[in-house]
């Protein structure tokens, strides 16, 4: 569950940056 949660957070960050761009 740890790694999966971390990947989810990274994905969310990428999406945020993509939207912010």
Curated annotation (Swiss-Prot):
Its main location: secreted. Disulfide bonds: none annotated. One of its GO terms (cellular component) is extracellular region. It is found in: Secreted, Extracellular space. Keywords: Copper, Oxygen transport, Secreted, Transport. GO terms for molecular function: oxygen carrier activity. It comes from the Eukaryota. Hemolymph. Belongs to the tyrosinase family. Hemocyanin subfamily. Hemocyanins are copper-containing oxygen carriers occurring freely dissolved in the hemolymph of many mollusks and arthropods. This is Hemocyanin subunit 4. It comes from Maja squinado.
């Amino acid at each position: 569950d740890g790694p999966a949660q971390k990947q989810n957070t990274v994905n969310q960050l990428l999406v945020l940056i993509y939207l912010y761009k």
